[in-house]
Curated annotation (Swiss-Prot):
Name this protein carries in UniProt: Elongation factor P
GO molecular function, one term: translation elongation factor activity
UniProt similarity note: Belongs to the elongation factor P family.
Organism: Mycoplasma mycoides subsp. mycoides SC (strain CCUG 32753 / NCTC 10114 / PG1)
UniProt cross-references to InterPro entries, sorted A to Z: Elong-fact-P_C, NA-bd_OB-fold, Rib_uL2_dom2, Transl_elong_fac_P/YeiP, Transl_elong_KOW-like, Transl_elong_P/YeiP_cen, Transl_elong_P/YeiP_CS, Transl_elongation_fac_P
Highest classification ranks of the organism: Bacteria, Bacillati, Mycoplasmatota, Mollicutes, Mycoplasmataceae
Amino acid sequence: MSVNDLRPGTTFLYDGNIYLVLEQAFSKTGRQQGKVTVKAKNMRTGARVELTFTGGEKVDKAMIERKEMQYLYNDGNDAYLMNTETYEQVSIPMTRLEWEKNFLVDGLMINMTEFENEVLGIDLPVKVELTVVEAEAAVKGDTTSGAQKKAILETGLEIMVPLFVNQGTKIIVSSADGKYVGRA
């Protein structure tokens, strides 16, 4: 595939790595051949890089497979997922799930991404239901609109929640930024 065809969301192979296009820009000056600048994420390491190609240069399209999986548990080193159709279990190193581990609860349905049977990572649901295990006491009289307090969730994630949220409350949290969305 030509680098001119790269668009956000496209995956491609370059220098032995798999990249996901985040942004793409084409620039041409005078008589020179155009340049394509791509901001991409290395799907193996998670590193974000900027790659520059000569217009018309070719790269291989990476066929990424997504499978719906159920999160089972983690043993500290690896997270274990199960394919609900075949009951096949797969493990992913927790080091690849630095942000995602804040939302992984038993039974959560997620999408696992893989390339040629190599597990690259997981895609979380947009919103996840979690339980508050510890919450600061609300200060009496602190009723300014939007007043918030700290709460620790069952996964260890610490977030700001409204004053009415107490220990044991089930809440909905955005997996994109870790912010409180609402009550479950």
